[in-house]
């Protein structure tokens, strides 16, 4: 689903629509989880909790845009919105195939949820039980939670951006551009001399987990990392007991991975003012831009890196 090619054109819009930011207990201001990533022609819905269908109406996005649903684990606040979303898509007459990814151990729960959906939909189920690629450009890695859980990472391949002025100076135009892209060299002119390196963009979701290697792998060089921040640092004991991240641990995860933008979410209902969590994450986030997600936010993917940081 991720694309990489040589192009003179800017990227299509890539945007995250935040549908909910609560953890297990919603509040008046925060619905349960839900994150819709609009990525070129794809719509990837992560962890739809209760009320996701209604939140999409408030956000002004159609369920028909969803092409893929990714569930990190089968606790209710991460998946109980699946039947409503599928039913709405069927009601709207969606004809395209919809792919549903989830941990293999959650098969009974997922099938029960799917059975509650009404209407006809071309739905394909994709359980996974180990780290690896589950679709083109989409990989999973195991997290450390109380039940089997996986985070997701969407990676666009690195590529090259053609520079029109350099093409013109080299006398290359029309069909010759395609030949140069295909062969890598044309009449002694290498592709590298008329183009610039373009790092692929990376997006990652790390939900319910204690700090672990899987979370670090997902976060590595992410342009946008959506990470749970259930507890403040002062509740580190609770975080360890329930296998969650504190705000500071989410910040440290971003720093270790060289993340550009860290979006905190999945907040405990005990917190009304989230600025404290942001500051705790910021203190350990290195150079990452730290933001607090709020319901119905729209977060644009950061502009491309000019170079890859190691």
Residue ranges and their predicted role:
Residues 8-59, 65, 152-154, 195-206, ...:
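Conserved beta-strand hairpin/beta-sheet module of binuclear metal-dependent hydrolase folds
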Residues 46-49, 66-74, 103, 204-209, ...:
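Active-site neighborhood of phospho(di)ester-bond hydrolases with catalytic His/Asp-centered motifs
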Residues 50-101, 124-131:
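Active-site metal-binding motif and surrounding structural segment of the metallo-beta-lactamase
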Residues 81-89, 110-113, 272-281:
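Metal-dependent catalytic neighborhoods of phosphoester/phosphodiester hydrolases
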Residues 130, 213-310:
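Binuclear metal-ion centers of metallo-dependent hydrolases, dominated by the metallo-beta-lactamase
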Residues 134-142, 154, 302-310:
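Short, surface-exposed amphipathic charged segments that create phosphate/polyanion-binding patches used
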Residues 139-218, 224-226:
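Active-site-proximal loop/helix segment associated with metal-binding centers of metalloenzymes
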């Amino acid at each position: 689903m991720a694309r990489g090619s040589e192009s003179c054109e800017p990227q299509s819009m890539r945007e995250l629509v935040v549908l909910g930011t609560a953890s297990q207990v919603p509040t008046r201001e925060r619905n349960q989880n839900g994150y819709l990533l609009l990525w070129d022609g794809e719509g990837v819905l992560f962890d739809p909790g209760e009320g996701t269908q209604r939140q999409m109406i408030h956000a002004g996005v159609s369920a028909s845009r969803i092409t893929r649903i990714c569930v990190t684990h089968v606790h209710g606040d991460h998946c109980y919105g699946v039947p409503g979303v599928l039913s709405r898509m069927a009601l709207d007459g969606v004809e395209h195939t919809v792919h549903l990814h989830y941990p293999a151990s959650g098969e009974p729960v997922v099938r029960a949820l799917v059975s509650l959906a009404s209407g006809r939909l071309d739905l394909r189920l994709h359980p996974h039980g180990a780290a690896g690629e589950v679709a083109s450009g989409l990989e999973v890695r195991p997290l450390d939670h109380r039940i089997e859980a996986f985070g997701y990472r969407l990676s666009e391949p690195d590529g090259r951006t053609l520079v029109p002025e350099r093409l013109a100076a080299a006398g290359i135009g029309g069909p010759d551009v395609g030949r140069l892209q295909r062969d890598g060299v044309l009449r002694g002119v290498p592709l590298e001399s008329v183009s610039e390196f373009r790092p692929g963009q990376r997006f990652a979701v790390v939900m319910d987990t204690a700090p672990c290697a899987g979370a670090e792998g997902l976060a590595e060089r992410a342009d946008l990392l959506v990470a749970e921040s259930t507890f403040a640092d002062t509740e580190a004991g609770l975080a360890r007991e329930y296998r969650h991240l504190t705000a500071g641990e989410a910040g440290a995860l971003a720093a270790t991975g060289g993340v550009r933008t860290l979006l905190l979410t999945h907040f405990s209902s005990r917190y009304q003012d989230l600025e404290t969590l942001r500051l705790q994450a910021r203190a350990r986030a290195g150079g990452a831009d730290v933001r607090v997600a709020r319901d119905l936010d729209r977060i644009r993917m950061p502009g491309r890196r000019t170079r890859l940081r190691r």
